[in-house]
A protein has these predicted regions:
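Hydrophobic alpha-helical segments and helix pairs
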Residues: 1-6
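ATP-binding/phosphotransfer module of carbohydrate and carboxylate kinases, centering on a glycine-rich
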Residues: 15-22, 27-167
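Short, intrinsically disordered, charge-biased short linear motifs at domain edges
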Residues: 7-16
Length: 167
């Protein structure tokens, strides 16, 4: 989707929480500020700061080394702090996806990026939550959530293809 002067479709800057976290764009509450890998890392660090007894500290003893996997590793280790971080992350991701699905009602939503490497640990609860948030529930058929086969390179390949078609 492309708007006037090739602008628009900046879904990362759709507000999902009014007055929320400050986004890199300067607005508050943007989808990207809650459901990106950067947001997951920020929330993991905050949670670790608040809970010095969390197993996350054993998984990643240095806050500077926290990455998009850290909270999921903690979840798999049974850490309650990590579980809360992942649950919140999935809730925000689901909210944004459901908002878009309620507008466009696609057959499928294809996710990309490093966090998608978490597979079913991410996708199973995300699918359940998204389909619960859809207008009319699954009456109109659930939205299929899947991971891009190009993984973390999907954006790069898409940008290259766009450039080849438009330059």
């Amino acid at each position: 989707f492309e708007g006037n002067r090739s602008a628009g479709a900046e879904i990362g800057h759709m507000v999902i929480r009014a007055g929320g976290e400050k986004c890199a764009c300067g607005r508050r509450g943007c989808f990207e500020a809650y459901a990106s890998a950067t947001a997951l890392i920020r929330q993991t660090k905050r949670a670790m700061d608040k809970d010095r007894a969390s197993q996350l500290w054993k998984i990643c003893p240095n806050l500077e080394d926290v990455d998009g996997k850290t909270a999921f590793d903690g979840l798999r280790a049974g850490d309650k702090t990590a579980e809360k971080v992942v649950k919140n992350y999935i809730a925000y991701l689901a909210e944004g996806i459901a908002n878009l699905a309620n507008i466009f009602r696609p057959n499928a939503v294809v996710l990309g990026g490093g966090v998608c490497a978490e597979g079913d640990t991410l996708l199973v609860p995300l699918r359940r939550k998204v389909n619960r948030l859809l207008y009319g529930g699954t009456k109109y058929a659930p939205v299929v959530l899947t991971v891009a086969t190009l993984g973390n390179d999907a954006g790069l390949v898409g940008a290259a293809r766009f450039a080849m078609q438009n330059c």
